[in-house]
Amino acid sequence: MYFTFTTIGIFDSMGAEAVDFITKQTELACIFTEQAYIEKIIAMKKDKLATTVKNLVSYDPVKPADVEACQAVGITLVEYSYVIEQGTNDTTPFRKCKQDDYPIFSYTSGTTGDSKGVKLTHTNLLSSA
């Protein structure tokens, strides 16, 4: 186990307010997404929602107009292939993760109020395997 980042699932069924709540609570700075959601994220930023988001990584080819629109709201937009290329060329050693690091925050739908987040550690995940 050598990755020390945390993943947080954001589902298309979540409304803008739920996404705003999750991004602020977790201080989420980067979202990996599909082309179809880029405009929605830009609109959220224009509405002063998801203010912690600074980077978008698109699994799909990026349109120049989307890059400009993202820049206008303070987001850097790149393609997933660019991230892979940068990682391939980076020789910085990984920081080995610890058993109590959190690889996943899992959020509920929040049927009563805001979404509830569950922090899962590496130990939690391995005990379920």
What are these regions (language model features)?
Residues P103-S127:
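Conserved AMP-binding A3 loop
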